[in-house]
């Protein structure tokens, strides 16, 4: 910006310095000397002052005239045309604020006068109607009594009615004039209101509340609405309708005003809540909550699950009241409603048979039950939990037979959880094995007593002392050695010692003093569940307390339903089951998880409410866990190569087998390959399972189930890989082979022979020829070689020429001399070693 002094400015405008200083003082500027600097703003102030002094203010014109000219041509007969020119002229006048205020005041006075006139008119009409009604009533009463009417006494009573007659006679003329005047003022008032509202909107002023109040008061009056509209009003309304402003819209306007302060809301927060639910409770958009959390340094999405503390912090920071609720309130109310009252009675013990695979657990139970269960299991190994009760001479005993294979760890843990006594079966010729130790750990974790059954004592290699010694290392000491665990020698094949085993079990049960309340509602645990094609979800229940009856409404984990039918372990229908009785129930809405607790509830509404709550809670916990896992692994997986994944869709016959297989298959793999069970369920392979496998490039595995017609059609058309299994060993081995194939192969070098250079010869054809002695292995022609000098590789190439006594040789064995020509290498020295090798591809293993 150029610095200009008063003197320079005077020279520029060609005016004396004294006159310019005088004008600047008149404009209110502080300049008194010719050397002072004048800024651009001060120049503008001086210019405005000079313009105002010459009556030429720089303002907008008060009047604007717009002229519009339209020219058109009309054609008439005879090829003649007539030019038509239409000129329109509009004048817009800008009024001063004083004029607008005076006009508004005048309009308000006129409106009040019109309202007063209309009110007077209404009061006059009401008064006239009342007087006419009183006169009619008086005339009717006079006609009903003719004798008194002939007397002169009633005349004074009629005088008050006839007195206002002159006023009523003069009223119509004055009322018509007042109505016309009021109507004209009303039209003018409406136009002024519209103009005033437009001016207010342009200036951004607040609406005139007093006028709105008057309009609302006028709307409340019933008479103006009931009055018929005249022709002038209708035409006026039509004209205003074309302008977009109707009388009806004005009537329907309300005087609602936005709240001046923030609205404080009550927010209810449970253990977990999503961002969208929190935003809905606070009546704000989800994006606002997301933006607020980004400012706090926490990136979230609108569907992310927040914990209670974080949600409370957000709601309180935004100024809302927070009420924390516990998610267990519904569960607590359910627990309070389940009352186990009544007389307690002794119940039969629940005994779980555990041990290593092929140690004879099921065969021992077969002898006790006088049945052949082991023959029915695929491969002769138990793959399901079998639950059945046995009536003995000494009382009833309920047995749970658990699998011994390593994949069924969860099944054995559930068996120990639902049991009173554990029979640990150990083969006398095999000793303590890994699953035997695991069974001891499960029994100790559940706090149940052990009874050790040393099986297969009829075999020649049976050694009872070895079993006692190995179990004592695990903390299980025999009674003969001063411990508290009974050891019983049995033979499932011959039946030896079975009675002593049952006696030891019942003795332990008497010590435990097991009791139950048969008259109470049933309560138990899910031992196994499956999806039957004809009957739907079927769950094996071990009743632990109370009595379960057909028709009861039961809640089982996140599933519920009414017991439609009950079957015992032999498949026979029963009406009720008491404590320690295993039964199969039908009627649930899904297959519950093995290990879920079953309870009889009062009504279906309560069962559905709790089941839906548990499903939602499980889903929220699963989402939160998945999100946490993503955040934890985001830096660990960064920069690593993506693993090769074998996708599997797995269908099994029972829920326990599904869990066991998912756990076993998930543990396979390494840093390069992994197994992912993308779909799993109980029941046959359906069309939806085949579509899932097709979409995700997965393999279909059926464990003791088969595919339906729709699934088989898709498998054949698309060429999917579908396999059936009935032994868990086979499915695990096949998956291991598939993963091994995905690993590929490694290239390994095998050293075939080593030759030591004893002398060097020159050949015009091959260059330097090394005279060598084969000191190790065999040297082959046309194989890759390495030249080593002081055990350091100095060259790697190919053996081009191999001769023995001037004859070409394909191989030279150890201890023989030969001549070796190395391709493209002539720097061979005495003492070097030539190493001949081959590259072999070797399959990798897990």
UniProtKB/Swiss-Prot annotation:
Binding-site residues, GTP: 355-362, 401-405, 455-458
Domain tr-type G: 346-513
Skewed-composition ranges (Low complexity): 136-148, 158-176
Naturally occurring in which organism (per UniProt): Pseudomonas putida (strain ATCC 47054 / DSM 6125 / CFBP 8728 / NCIMB 11950 / KT2440)
G2: region residues: 380-384
G1: region residues: 355-362
Pfam families, A to Z: EF-G_D2 (PF22042), GTP_EFTU (PF00009), IF-2 (PF11987), IF2_assoc (PF08364), IF2_N (PF04760)
Descriptive protein name: Translation initiation factor IF-2
Positions of the UniProt region annotated as G3: 401-404
Role: One of the essential components for the initiation of protein synthesis. Protects formylmethionyl-tRNA from spontaneous hydrolysis and promotes its binding to the 30S ribosomal subunits. Also involved in the hydrolysis of GTP during the formation of the 70S ribosomal complex.
CDD domains: IF2_eIF5B, IF2_mtIF2_II, mtIF2_IVc
Biased composition (Basic and acidic residues): 96-135, 177-206, 230-239
Region (Disordered): 94-263
């Amino acid at each position: 910006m150029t610095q200009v002094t008063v003197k320079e400015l005077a020279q520029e405008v060609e005016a004396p310095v004294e006159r310019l200083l005088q004008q600047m003082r008149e404009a209110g500027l502080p300049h008194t000397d010719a050397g002072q600097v004048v800024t651009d703003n001060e120049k503008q102030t001086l210019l405005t002052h000079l313009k105002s002094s010459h009556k030429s203010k720089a303002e907008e014109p008060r009047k604007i005239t717009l002229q519009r000219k339209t020219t058109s041509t009309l054609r008439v007969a005879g090829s003649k045309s007539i030019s038509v020119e239409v000129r329109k002229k509009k004048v817009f006048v800008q009024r001063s604020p004083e004029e607008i205020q005076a006009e508004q005041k005048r309009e308000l006075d006129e409106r009040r006068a019109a309202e007063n006139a209309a009110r007077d008119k209404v009061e006059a009409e009401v008064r006239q109607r009342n007087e006419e009604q009183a006169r009619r009533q008086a005339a009717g009463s006079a006609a009903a009594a003719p004798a008194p009417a002939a007397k002169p006494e009633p005349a004074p009573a009629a005088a008050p009615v006839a007195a206002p007659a002159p006023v009523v006679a003069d009223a119509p003329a004055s009322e018509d004039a007042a109505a016309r005047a009021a109507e004209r003022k009303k039209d003018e008032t409406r136009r002024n209101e519209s103009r005033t509202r437009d001016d207010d909107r342009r200036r951004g002023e607040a609406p005139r509340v007093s006028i709105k109040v008057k309009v609302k008061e006028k709307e409340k009056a019933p008479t103006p609405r009931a009055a018929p509209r005249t022709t002038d009003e209708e035409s006026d309304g039509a004209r205003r309708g074309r302008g977009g402003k109707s009388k009806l819209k004005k009537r329907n306007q309300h005087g609602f005003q936005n709240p001046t302060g923030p609205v404080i809301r009550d927010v209810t927060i449970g253990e977990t809540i999503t961002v969208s639910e929190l935003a809905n409770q606070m009546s704000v958009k989800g994006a606002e909550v997301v933006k607020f959390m980004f400012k706090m340094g926490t990136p979230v999405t609108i569907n992310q699950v927040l914990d209670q503390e974080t949600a409370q912090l957000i709601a309180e920071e935004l100024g809302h009241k927070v009420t924390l609720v516990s998610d267990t309130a519904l569960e607590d109310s359910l627990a309070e409603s389940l009352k186990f009252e009544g007389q307690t009675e002794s119940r039969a013990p629940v005994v779980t048979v555990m041990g290593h695979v092929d140690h004879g657990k099921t065969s021992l139970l077969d002898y006790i039950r006088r049945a052949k269960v082991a023959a029915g299991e695929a491969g002769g190994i138990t793959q399901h939990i079998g639950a059945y009760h046995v009536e003995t001479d000494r009382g009833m005993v309920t047995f749970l037979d658990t699998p011994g294979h390593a994949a069924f760890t969860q099944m054995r843990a559930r068996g120990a959880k639902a049991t009173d006594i554990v029979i640990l079966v150990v083969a006398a010729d095999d000793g303590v094995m890994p699953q035997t130790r695991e069974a001891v750990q499960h029994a100790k974790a559940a706090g149940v007593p052990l009874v050790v059954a040393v099986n297969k004592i009829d075999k020649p290699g049976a050694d009872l002392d070895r079993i006692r010694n190995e179990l004592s290392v695990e903390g299980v000491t025999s009674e003969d050695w001063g411990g508290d665990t009974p050891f019983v020698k049995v033979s499932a094949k011959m039946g030896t010692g079975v009675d002593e085993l049952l006696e030891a079990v019942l003795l332990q049960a008497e010590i435990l003093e097991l009791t139950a309340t048969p008259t109470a509602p049933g309560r138990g645990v899910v031992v196994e569940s499956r999806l039957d094609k004809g009957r739907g979800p079927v769950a094996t229940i071990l009743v632990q307390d109370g009595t379960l009856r057909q028709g009861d409404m039961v809640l089982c984990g996140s599933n519920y339903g009414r017991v439609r039918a009950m079957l015992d372990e032999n498949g026979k229908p029963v009406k009720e089951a008491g404590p320690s009785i295993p039964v199969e129930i039908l009627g649930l809405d899904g297959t519950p998880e093995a290990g879920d607790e079953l309870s009889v509830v009062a009504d279906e509404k309560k069962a559905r409410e709790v089941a839906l709550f548990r499903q939602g809670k499980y889903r929220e916990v699963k989402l939160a866990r998945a999100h946490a896992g993503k955040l934890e692994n985001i830096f660990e997986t960064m920069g690593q190569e993506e693993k090769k994944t074998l996708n599997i869709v797995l269908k099994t016959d029972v829920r326990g087998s599904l869990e066991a297989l998912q756990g076993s298959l998930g543990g396979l793999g390494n840093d390069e390959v992994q197994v992912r069970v993308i779909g799993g369920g109980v029941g046959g392979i359906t069309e939806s399972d085949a579509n899932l496998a097709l979409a995700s490039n997965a393999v279909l595995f059926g464990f003791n189930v088969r595919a339906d017609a729709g699934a088989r059609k898709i498998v054949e058309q698309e060429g999917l890989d579908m396999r059936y299994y009935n032994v868990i060993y086979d499915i695990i081995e096949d998956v291991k082979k598939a993963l091994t194939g995905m690993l590929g192969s490694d290239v390994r070098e095998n050293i075939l022979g080593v030759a030591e250079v004893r002398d060097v010869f020159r050949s015009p054809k091959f260059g330097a020829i090394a005279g060598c002695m084969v000191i190790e292995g065999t040297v082959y022609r046309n194989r890759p070689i390495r030249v080593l000098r002081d055990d350091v590789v100095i060259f790697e190439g190919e053996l081009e020429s191999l001769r023995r006594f001037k004859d070409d040789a394909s191989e030279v064995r150890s201890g023989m001399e030969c001549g070796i020509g190395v391709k493209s290498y002539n720097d061979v020295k005495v003492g070097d070693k030539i190493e001949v090798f081959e590259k072999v591809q070797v399959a990798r293993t897990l």
